[in-house]
Amino acid sequence: PCGFFIVDSFSFSGWPVSGSISAISTPLDSSFTTTQRTKTWENVTIKEIGTEIAGRAGIALAWDVEGTPFTIKSVEQSEQTDCEFYMNLCNTYGLAMKVYAQKIVVYDREAYKKKGAAAVLSPSSMKSWSWQQDQAGTYTGGEFTYTSPATEKEIKVTVGKGSRILKQSGKADSKADAERKIKAAVAKANHGKTKLSATIVGNASLVASQCVRVVGLGKLSGKYYIDTITHNVSGSGGYTMDLEMSLVEE
């Protein structure tokens, strides 16, 4: 099974008569994606925030991040839905969030990219494919500037080196907090610079966040991370899946 889904739209057309059903994976409690909230979260971890938000939505939090969760001194949820706020917060710190099997799943995408391939894709298993590489927007390091809450002095934190430095500024609790944020920003900017899209015969064992090994495409072959999967079922084409993938640098 692919998990639990809620039908959000359906349509019919003719002739011949055909129908289309669209469904999304989301908690049964619609407030998770519709109710805007304003709250100041203080002295709390991302995991603790997720536990409270998941509980409010009537589902569980699945936390798959190594290490002890760090404490955030304060973060504002300002007229945002729980879904929007929590996804943005996770992204800020280099974590990914998805709703799957009636759970909010939080994981470290960079750590997942180091896992072994869940399947091998060859040209014979692809109904169609397309490849794209974009060098613009990739970085060798980063610099984050913030004002110290204690001294009110401007502090710069740098990671990496080279000529392509991503520069950001904003709020940070400490140097360690600023470093987490800029590392996450660099990883996010570099992810997906090489993309592969493929349509394959349906394989329900594959899920987004897994890696696959692509073979038989010459220099385009390699290990790819699955960003998204779209499942398609039709009377003429059977069960197929559209995979959007990003190359994993090895």
Enumerate the language-model features and the residues they cover.
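Surface-exposed cap/loop segments at beta↔alpha junctions
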Residues: 1-60
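Well-ordered beta-strand positions in beta-sheet-rich domains
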Residues: 1-6, 20, 38, 118, ...
